[in-house]
Amino acid sequence: MPTPHIEAQDGEFAETVLMPGDPLRAKFIADNFLDDAKCITQVRNMLGYTGTYKGKRVSVMGSGMGVPSISIYATELYKDYGVEKIIRIGSCGAVRDDIKIRDIVIGMAASTDSNVNRQRFHNVDFAACADFSLLKSVVDTAEKLGKPVHVGNIFTADLFYTPQPEKFATMEKYGILAVEMEAAGLYGVAAEYGKKALTVLTVSDHIKTGEKTTSEERETTFKDMMELTLESVL
């Protein structure tokens, strides 16, 4: 039944949900990759769709920006709609020289400056990591499709406009691949409910070089990431 933030009926979500931050990216995926896609929720214009990809039933829904927003939607999907797997597909800022604009980054784990997982985990640090089976499937699919990917630790930030840019040098030293704003929250919710989660990202900005993509490009052109993720769930 509908929740405070999702109006879909029971059974309208597939067991696998792809979750971009931007609801218009969810619409783009539904319009361009899914067959027989149906809009099943649009509360607060957070669009969600269910359709099929090569015969596989799949849903896609926006999460909004930041840990609090994705935590709300992931909780309701896992707890109230029986969703088993959520794969965040989004954008990130690279912090290493060997990672370029439009490269694909897969978040094996997510460090963070957010406090939400400490609140969940009795005020001690929780190692927020992806589900191995989802991770392996995406990496194997990337190899099969000949798509190069970077796999490793990412950083989930609470602030987009950080007052502490010196943190990026520390991230690079410790092998962080890129910065985004949701993965650690998603991984924490998945762990809380015994479900599966993964994050697959396209580099939209490079923190060191200042290169960036436009908002229109972020909405519609990251097709390698979308295709890779959909192929991995077949």
Swiss-Prot record:
Protein name (record): Purine nucleoside phosphorylase DeoD-type
PANTHER family per the UniProt record, alphabetical: PURINE NUCLEOSIDE PHOSPHORYLASE DEOD-TYPE, URIDINE PHOSPHORYLASE
Role summary: Catalyzes the reversible phosphorolytic breakdown of the N-glycosidic bond in the beta-(deoxy)ribonucleoside molecules, with the formation of the corresponding free purine bases and pentose-1-phosphate.
Binding site for phosphate: G21, R25, R44, R88, I89, G90, S91
First-tier enzyme category under EC: transferase
Catalytic activity annotation: a purine D-ribonucleoside + phosphate = a purine nucleobase + alpha-D-ribose 1-phosphate; a purine 2'-deoxy-D-ribonucleoside + phosphate = a purine nucleobase + 2-deoxy-alpha-D-ribose 1-phosphate
GO annotation, biological process: purine nucleoside catabolic process
One GO molecular-function entry: purine-nucleoside phosphorylase activity
Short name of one Pfam family: PNP_UDP_1
NCBIfam families referenced in this protein's UniProt entry, alphabetically: deoD, PRK05819.1, PRK13374.1
Assembly: Homohexamer; trimer of homodimers.
Active-site residues, as the UniProt record annotates them: D205
Annotated positions binding a purine D-ribonucleoside: H5, E180, M181, E182, S204, D205
Protein family membership: Belongs to the PNP/UDP phosphorylase family.
InterPro entries: DeoD-type, Nucleoside_phosphorylase_CS, Nucleoside_phosphorylase_d, Nucleoside_phosphorylase_sf
Known EC number: 2.4.2.1
Entry keyword Flavoprotein: no
